[in-house]
Curated annotation (Swiss-Prot):
InterPro entries from the UniProt entry: H1/H5 (IPR005819), Histone_H1/H5_H15 (IPR005818), WH-like_DNA-bd_sf (IPR036388), WH_DNA-bd_sf (IPR036390)
Molecular functions (GO terms): double-stranded DNA binding; nucleosomal DNA binding; structural constituent of chromatin
GO biological process: chromosome condensation; negative regulation of DNA recombination; nucleosome assembly
UniProt protein name: Histone H1.1
Function, in words: Histones H1 are necessary for the condensation of nucleosome chains into higher-order structures.
Region Disordered: start-end pairs: 1-52, 104-250
Keywords: Chromosome, DNA-binding, Nucleus
Source species: Drosophila virilis (Fruit fly)
Compartmental location: Nucleus; Chromosome
Record's compositionally biased regions (Basic and acidic residues): 122-133, 174-191
UniProt similarity note: Belongs to the histone H1/H5 family.
Domain spans labelled H15: 44-118
SMART domains for the chain: H15
GO cellular component: nucleosome; nucleus
Amino acid sequence: MSDSAVATSASPVIAQAASGEKKVSTKKGSSTPESKKSTAAPPSHPPTQQMVDASIKNLKERGGSSLLAIKKYIGATYKCDAQKLAPFIKKYLKNAVANGNVIQTKGKGASGSFKLSASANKDAKPKASAVEKKTKKVNASAARATKSKSSTSTTKKAAGAADKKLSKSAAAKKNVEKKKADKEKAKDAKKTGTIKAKPTTAKAKSSATKPKTPKPKTTSAKPKKVVSATTPKKTAVKKPKAKTASATKK
């Protein structure tokens, strides 16, 4: 009886231990892929193609950029180990020369100097990395929040200033309209004054022309004087003839 009691009492302990081991094993198995996913950090630099194109473009060397200059530029700007990336850089340069995206001005293989072609210059704009994009998004959201706060205050100020400007502009418009109305009234008054003055000048002209009508009377009176002047001349000529005839008879 004692042996059976010990066996029965020990069995639940073994069962609990086995269940605990299973739970631990399941937890470990489930945690490993998640930990791998979480630890896989995004790359801190863009692809080698973009880095090489950007370095050649920004170095702006007339004879072309050498491999050492490209490595130095990549290490300084992107803060990565350029020596580890050297085989990838060489491979890209060879493929780019074969495709025509890069022109090799000196040397052979990856040891010479390189220039971007005309088509590659257009497409060589460096794209921001994923980390830079995230930081830009965070900064942009913070900037938007600050801008929204400042914009509300500025909109209130702008609204008050706009109301003041509107009131000032309305008053200025009223003054301008009043001035225009006064000018129009003055013009109308001048026009009416000139129109009223015109008939007086016409009347003066008519009164001045009326005395000219008696001129024909003076012309009719002049021939009468001429006729009276001619008759005495005829009598003066006839009288000497009569005197000569009486003298001959005597």
